[in-house]
């Protein structure tokens, strides 16, 4: 892309979510992680404006795609551009340090094209949370469609949040150390 910041105006929801996450992380750091239970029945239904055609074209070019193959369509794998903005709203108040969350997987079920130039109808929902005390796996579901292509994409995002706890009865073992009397026997392995 010739102008890397050209499309930043289209990233408002994601940037707001990242800013809100940073504020939440600071609050959790100074006040402690809250204990507000997550509403597993919560879902968010929104209609988003059509994706900008120039942004989509630049995205296709940036990913090495064929613009002719995607002519008149939004690539399904661009869904994070609208889904991540909803993630924070969906998980707002979750009792987990979300700033530590890492991607634990993504599954996409493609049921049809996402036409370019049509508003997106998105339903975001929380599918479940698997918390074993050491880590929490948060499963979210995003269904995206348009008026002419409803339910075109069903995407599931999994996020893993390390909690730092230990299993019951698990003893902490000493970290392995190099003995003081050890000496180096080599520095290079030759595989020839």
PLM regions with names:
Residues 1-103, 166-192:
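Hot-dog-fold acyl-thioester-processing enzymes
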Residues 2-9, 68, 108, 146-157:
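Acyl-thioester-processing domains in fatty-acid/polyketide/NRPS systems
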Residues 44-45, 51-55, 114, 121-122, ...:
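Hydrophobic/basic alpha-helical segments enriched in Actinobacteria
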Residues 105-148:
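Hydrophobic beta-sheet segments that form the core/acyl-binding groove
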Residues 130, 135-192:
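An exposed, glycine/acidic-rich loop-and-rim segment of catalytic or binding clefts
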């Amino acid at each position: 892309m010739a102008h890397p910041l050209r499309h930043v105006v289209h990233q408002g929801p994601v940037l707001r979510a990242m800013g809100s996450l940073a504020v939440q992380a600071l609050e959790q750091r100074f006040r402690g992680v809250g204990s507000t239970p997550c509403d597993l029945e919560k879902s968010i239904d929104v209609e988003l404006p059509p994706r900008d055609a120039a942004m989509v074209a630049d995205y296709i070019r940036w990913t090495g795609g064929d613009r002719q193959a995607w002519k008149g369509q939004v690539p399904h794998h661009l869904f994070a551009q609208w889904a991540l903005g909803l993630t924070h709203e969906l998980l707002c108040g979750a009792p987990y340090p979300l700033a530590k969350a890492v991607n634990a997987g993504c599954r996409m079920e493609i049921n049809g094209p996402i036409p370019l130039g049509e508003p997106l109808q998105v339903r975001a929902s929380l599918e479940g949370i698997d918390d074993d005390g050491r880590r929490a796996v948060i499963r979210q579901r995003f269904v995206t469609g348009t008026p002419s292509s409803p339910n075109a994409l069903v995407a599931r995002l999994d996020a893993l949040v390390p909690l730092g706890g230990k299993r019951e009865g698990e003893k902490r073992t000493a970290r392995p150390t190099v003995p003081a009397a050890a000496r180096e026997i080599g520095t290079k392995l030759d595989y020839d």
